[in-house]
A protein has these predicted regions:
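N-terminal, positively charged nucleic-acid-binding surface of large information/translation enzymes
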Residues: 1-235, 259, 276-289, 293-308, ...
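Conserved short loop/turn motifs at secondary-structure junctions
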Residues: 5-6, 79-82, 110-115, 139-150, ...
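Active-site-adjacent bridging/hinge elements
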Residues: 32-40, 62, 98-101, 126-133, ...
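Structured ligand/cofactor/substrate-binding pocket environments in proteins
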Residues: 52-64, 71, 80-81, 149-152, ...
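Short, polar/flexible loop-turn hinges at active-site or ligand-entry regions and domain interfaces
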Residues: 97-112, 382-383, 537, 558-567, ...
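Short Cys/His-rich metal-coordination motifs, predominantly Zn2+-binding knuckles/fingers
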Residues: 179, 252, 349, 420-422, ...
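Short acidic-hydrophobic surface loop/beta-edge motif
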Residues: 198-206, 245-250, 344-347, 417, ...
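Feature 926 captures the class I aminoacyl-tRNA synthetase adenylation module centered on the KMSKS loop
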Residues: 199, 394-454, 458, 502-545, ...
Length: 895
């Protein structure tokens, strides 16, 4: 048996293992009686890995590795998204750097440039996913612009078009003047901004009861050029006399009516609301109701169109300034108020979006949303954590028709064709240049492309042969679970459910697992613009993939967001450290060192069954069996954080700190039979532990497992740990021994109390101490039976156990797990001086705690201080509260 190296080097071991696994085709579909198929949320084809991807992919790989070991037929589908706006923006930028514009080279050459870009940079994120250790089938990569996938997208559009679920119409859309395309409601990002509320006077055509003008309040004076009405609330009786009257719109001298409408909030501004149907969704709705003219005053660049004199040619910001100046100059600016309000921005470039009337393609959702809501209500699709169910259902209730057209070139071109000769129009599965109605040749295709989410909504079934080979879906669809972020519950999850129900007549997945958003250390969202994003590849380079993966899993709780503790260089933004990931690396080292110690002491080992020959053996086997059952249940129910924390606590505390330490005597000084049996026991415990740890930390566990001989209970026939068997909870259930666990835990409690007392009073670990234990009647006998063990392991010179013993002089008391232990310190410690010191420390801690609590109770401080400062104060208050309790307990120990 080749000895394990002294140090484990993840940078050398991890890439080597990836190559071995792939060469042996371990990532392909595994065989089993039951299926578990998972689709990876497709990242942008030319993107790079970020922390959200790292969390998502770690969770999926943990689940897939576990399911593969459980014997399921697993399939994890890899693929990338063509990312319409993102890719086109990057190619546009590249061409501009070369002095070229896409308009100059035309659509076809621009698309060639997009394909070149995709081929050049498209493999980056896939290679990064591979470096993480994701056991996904890299030989079967999907792409949303592949010929097969494009046909699926086209069929969905054509079928919905002919089923009258897709229509074209003029609607208010969120228009990005920079990207020159519409953005769906769900893609718009909102930001609070400081703005103004301008009060503008509009003259009445004829005075009413001596009133010559009305005053409207608006945040967007520049759009007044397109006003075609003024609205008041039906619940505002003071303005009833003005309903039906006419206003002369300043600058353009347009006559516009005053009307009442329920959209108006009588308490906003003056109660008079300017109505601009072409530039506001609510105004558009009022315009439809009251038959108002729709006047678009901006072009696609948000520049005022011709026909408005000195204001034409101005962009919207310039127009705002000029129009406000005009109103002020003509005595029609009443006053201006400061206003904080929420403003929509493009998620891609950050430009303020413009509500803009344009002709777009829409999906009518009324017939689609009810079935999609019902499958969640009746439990066919389950959200984890459960609280996201209501988020989904609320969004479905308020769902509006979906704008699916984008004014781009890169993407799935809308397959609608028009005849310029006879006006024929239809959606087709095949391109045509001949009109089927009149035979004319003046046929052209719609210029727009489909929203990226339109194609990605088909991801669970279009990646598996649909529509040409629906038989490939059998046994693999619905998929098992979709792991994704909360940001796209509306954008993607809901639409996947709607389209899958419509086209496959079944749900796309049984479960939806929503993971927490990873925030920067200060609690802000990670982003390129802020420079606070952490590159997962930097973490892997510094700490190894296992450490990063394990740290991410332990971050998972039921909280909505988690802070990542990475420290970045303020200038270069390069990673300096991540203390939690460093702790995870220490766990990797612990696994390696503990396993190496056992492997180095296996001389003369032969495989054989584990057998409990000592109390610690019985305790260990019982704990092991329970942890197998617990981790199995946790992974089955998507409890990834609980699983990771459970297995670490077990392996580090129970296996390493206790069991291996307690086995050293038999391993090093036992009889040949004792030595062989403890070797078998240790190999068995390590074998099971590596299997349990493997889904989270595949590399170090594979390396350890490969270095270990076969245990006598679990099969070691598989070439790799990743395709070996998961420990069967039922087969190990016979190891559970509640009495053995309880009794040994009592002994551990006493030993821990003695050790902690030595540490607390700064005594040498080799100092023998006398101990008296006050125990419940039912535990006295068990403790006495283990007296030799306690005295040997705990370095206890004498041990007394009784129900009601006398507390010895010069002793301190430690209470834990129903036991009261008196540790005799005698002359080893000056108890009076120690008590005095502790009392002084207690008073100091209480004083500081009082000051921190006063600060946190100060509303002025809480209102003005930065969130990270407040969080630091709260953390300090928690630390001091714990310290006060500890000091009070230590002082009480002397009594």
């Amino acid at each position: 048996m080749e000895e394990m190296p002294k140090n484990y080097d993840p940078q050398a071991a991890e890439p080597e293992l990836i190559e071995k696994w792939m060469k042996a085709d371990c990532y392909g579909r595994s065989k089993g009686t039951e299926d578990r198929t998972v689709v990876i949320p497709p990242p942008n084809v030319t993107g790079i890995l970020h922390m959200g991807h790292a969390m998502d992919d770690t969770i999926q790989d943990t689940y897939i590795r576990y399911s593969r070991m459980r014997g399921y037929s697993t399939r994890w589908i890899l693929g990338t998204d063509h990312a319409g706006i993102a890719t086109q923006t990057k190619v546009d930028k590249k061409l501009k750097s070369e002095g070229i514009s896409r308009l100059e080279i035309g659509r076809e050459k621009f698309l060639d440039a997009c394909w070149d870009w995709t081929r050049e940079y498209g493999g980056t994120i896939v290679s990064q996913i591979k470096r993480m250790g994701c056991s996904i089938d890299f030989n079967d990569e999907k792409f949303t612009m592949s010929p097969e996938y494009t046909q699926a997208v086209r069929k969905v559009f054509v079928d919905w078009y002919h089923d009258q679920l897709i229509y074209r119409g003029k609607r208010i859309v969120n228009w990005c003047p920079h990207c020159e395309t519409s953005i769906s409601d769900d893609e718009a990002e909102y930001a609070d901004e400081k703005g103004h509320l301008w009060y503008l006077r509009y003259p009445l055509k004829e005075p009413v009861n001596g009133v010559e003008y009305i005053t409207v309040a608006t945040t967007r004076p520049e759009t007044m050029l397109g006003d075609t009405g003024v609205a008041v609330s039906p619940q505002d009786p003071e303005k009833a006399d003005l309903v039906g009257k006419t206003v002369i719109l300043p600058i353009v001298d347009r006559e516009i009516p005053i009307f009442s409408d329920w959209h108006v909030d009588a308490g906003f501004g003056t109660g008079f609301v300017k109505v601009t149907p072409a530039h506001d969704p609510n105004d558009f709705a009022m315009g439809q109701t009251h038959n108002l003219e729709q006047i678009n005053i901006f072009d696609e660049h948000a520049v005022v169109v011709d026909g408005y004199g000195e204001f034409s040619g101005l962009d919207r910001d310039q127009a705002r300034e000029a129009i406000v100046a005009w109103f002020e100059e003509h005595g029609l600016l009443d006053h201006v108020e400061d206003l904080d309000h929420s403003v929509m921005h493009c998620y891609r470039c950050g430009t303020t979006l413009e509500p803009w009337l344009s002709e777009q393609w829409f999906v009518a959702v009324d017939k689609l949303k009810e079935p999609a809501a019902q499958v969640v209500k009746d439990g066919q699709v389950t959200f984890h954590p459960e609280r996201w169910t209501q988020t989904y259902l609320t969004w479905m209730e308020n769902l509006r028709d979906w704008n699916i057209s984008r004014q781009l070139w890169w993407g799935h071109r809308i397959p609608v064709f028009y005849c310029d000769d006879c006006g024929w129009q239809d959606a087709l599965m095949e391109d045509t240049d001949v009109c089927p109605k009149c035979g004319g040749h003046h046929v052209h295709q719609d210029e727009d492309v489909l929203d990226t989410w339109f194609s990605s909504q088909l991801w669970t079934f279009a990646t598996q042969g649909w529509p040409d080979h629906p038989e490939q879906l059998e046994g693999h669809h619905p998929t098992q679970v979709l792991v994704t972020a909360r940001d796209i519950i509306a954008l993607w999850v809901a639409r996947m459910i709607m389209s899958s129900l419509y086209f496959t007549k079944e749900i796309p997945f049984h479960d939806v697992y929503i993971y927490a958003t990873i925030l920067a250390k200060d609690g802000s969202r990670m982003s390129k613009s802020k420079g606070n994003g952490v590159d997962p590849m930097d973490l892997i380079a510094k700490y190894g993939a296992d450490a990063m993966r394990y740290n991410l899993l332990t971050l998972i709780t039921n909280n909505q967001d988690v802070k990542f503790d990475a420290v970045l260089d303020k200038k270069t933004r390069e990673l300096i450290e991540s203390p939690r990931t460093d702790q995870a690396r220490s766990f990797v080292t612990k696994i390696w060192n503990a396993s190496r110690f056992v492997q180095m002491n296996l001389d003369g080992y032969t495989a054989g069954m584990p057998k409990a020959e000592t109390p610690e053996d019985a305790w260990m086997f019982s704990r092991l069996a329970k942890v197998v059952a617990e981790t199995t249940e946790q992974l089955e129910t998507y409890g990834f954080g609980e699983y990771a924390r459970n297995i670490q606590s077990f392996f580090w505390n129970d296996v390493c700190d206790w069991y291996i330490e307690l086995c050293k005597g038999r391993l090093l000084d036992g009889t040949p039979d004792q030595r062989l049996q403890v070797q078998r026991n240790l190999v068995f415990v390590l074998d099971v532990s590596m299997r349990l740890l493997h889904p989270a930390m595949p590399f170090v566990t594979e390396s350890v497992w490969d270095a270990l001989p076969a245990s006598g209970l679990l099969s070691h026939d598989a070439e790799f740990l990743m395709i070996s068997e998961w420990p069967d909870p039922e087969k190990l259930a016979s190891f559970v021994d509640e009495a053995a666990e309880h009794n040994f835990s009592l002994a551990k409690t006493v030993v821990s109390a003695v050790r902690s007392s030595r540490a607390r009073y700064r005594l040498s670990p080799k100092t023998d101490l006398a101990v008296v234990v006050k125990a419940p009647a039912q535990d006295v006998a068990a403790l006495k039976e283990q007296a030799a063990f306690i005295q040997n392991v705990g370095r206890v010179s004498s041990l007394e156990v009784a129900e009601a013993p006398q507390k010895p002089a010069g002793s301190v008391s430690v209470t834990d797990a129903g036991l009261e232990m008196y540790v005799v310190l005698g002359e080893l410690v000056d108890l009076a001086a120690e008590a005095k010191r502790l009392q002084k420390d207690l008073e100091s801690a209480k004083k500081e705690l009082s000051g921190v609590e006063r600060t946190l109770a100060n509303q002025g401080f809480v209102a003005k201080a930065a969130p990270e400062v407040i969080e630091k104060k709260r953390a300090r208050a928690e630390e001091l509260t714990t310290l006060v309790a500890q000091l009070e307990q230590q002082i009480a120990d002397f009594s």
